[in-house]
Regions:
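Structured, helix-rich domain cores that form ligand/interaction pockets
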Residues: 1-294, 314-356
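Helix-turn-helix DNA-binding segment
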Residues: 295-303, 307-309, 313
Length: 356
């Protein structure tokens, strides 16, 4: 099986002494947008040699976010450039920016067929007809387009399956299988991706398409435990510069999010069933979610709420003087457990006094 691995999305959570990028560094170009984002007041596109290189979000809208923090996203074309890491590190060093963690990374494998010639459409059809059973996350969607084809005097409707995904926008990680050739043809063509396919020996024609299995990992999914060793594994910038580490990360998440077994009768323990081999048997880690960083932990949500509302709960007591400290602890706890967005949504409601 021939496939090409790549990073298709990379966003870094960073900090600097000033909390802003220095737009007087003349090696790069800077374009300030007329609007910011939901979480940051300013959005700046950084250009390199006249092409969009980075998108920088700066100046937090809320005190919940870390002061002087920035989010730096690498523009898609540069992710496929061999000199991407050199250019990115040069920018970070010149602006004295420190990377704290990865906000999001998408790692993809592009191929024509799975291991042993299994066609992606065959996999999708077998799953939808219950011939195959998915192991793991139950939320998912199938994607298709339908068309009519004339047969004699009549026309017949057909379905063309274009994708299958597991997970949701709220998930720490999700997997998405889709027809990348079809997307480039119908949404936006990207010649640099087609060049990657050509260099990798993939076929991209009208009859033979390139498919992509995309693993999208958010900040709360960057840390996990390897069941076999008991050790914690943390996805960071350094690991993403190593092609072997990238492959390990991809196959680890692909195994935990996009695995199938034959759906036979009498299955009592799915973990003992042989899995359908999709790739070439590359090394992977036996991923286990760390409880301490689980965004769905009810106890953590209750504790964050109690800390945030401390001044209202204990009004009239000396403890109210420590309201700022309590909120700071709540913010740090939310950040450590992947609940920052949840806290941002709740804080306005919590800041409304419940008693007069």
């Amino acid at each position: 099986m021939i496939y090409a691995l790549s990073i298709d999305w990379l966003a870094l959570f960073c900090t600097s002494e000033s909390g802003r990028i220095n737009q007087y560094q003349h090696y790069w170009g800077y374009k300030l947008h007329a609007h910011g984002t939901r979480q940051y007041q300013e959005l700046i596109t950084v250009t390199l040699h006249g092409e969009d290189f980075l998108e920088v979000q700066q100046i937090p809208c809320s005190s919940i976010l870390q002061p002087r923090s920035l989010i730096i996203k690498v523009c898609n074309r540069f992710l496929y450039s061999r000199g991407m890491w050199y250019c990115l590190n040069s920018f970070l060093d010149a602006h004295k920016i420190q990377v704290l963690n990865i906000s999001r990374v998408d790692i993809c494998a592009d191929f024509n067929k799975f291991h042993n010639g299994l066609h992606p459409i065959t996999l999708i059809k077998q799953f939808l007809s219950s011939e195959l059973r998915h192991i793991g996350r139950g939320i998912g969607n199938a994607h298709f387009n339908h068309f009519a084809k004339k047969e004699g005097k009549y026309s017949k409707s057909y379905l063309n399956y274009t994708g299958l995904n597991f997970g949701s926008n709220e998930s720490a990680a999700r997997a998405y299988l889709y027809n990348k050739s079809f997307e480039l043809l119908t949404v936006k063509d990207k010649p640099y991706i087609r060049q990657l396919w050509k260099e990798s020996g993939l076929t991209d024609t009208k009859d033979v398409n390139v498919w992509r299995l995309e693993i999208s990992i958010k900040s709360k999914g960057m840390a996990f435990k390897d069941k076999d060793t008991g050790e914690k594994y943390q996805i960071d910038k350094e690991k993403l510069t190593d092609t072997c580490e990238i492959a390990t990360i991809f196959h680890t998440f692909a195994r935990s999010l996009f695995s199938f077994i034959k759906n036979r009768e009498g299955i009592t323990n799915v973990t003992r069933e042989p899995r359908i081999q999709l790739f070439n048997g590359e090394p992977y880690l036996n991923r286990c979610v760390l409880e301490s960083v689980s965004g769905g932990n009810r106890t953590e949500r209750i504790l964050i709420k109690q800390l945030w509302q401390m001044s209202d709960t204990y009004r009239g007591n000396e403890i109210v003087e420590d309201e700022g400290i309590a909120k700071m602890v709540a913010v740090k706890l939310a950040s450590a457990t992947g609940l920052t967005n949840w806290l941002i949504k709740k804080r306005d409601l919590w800041d409304t006094p419940t008693r007069k």
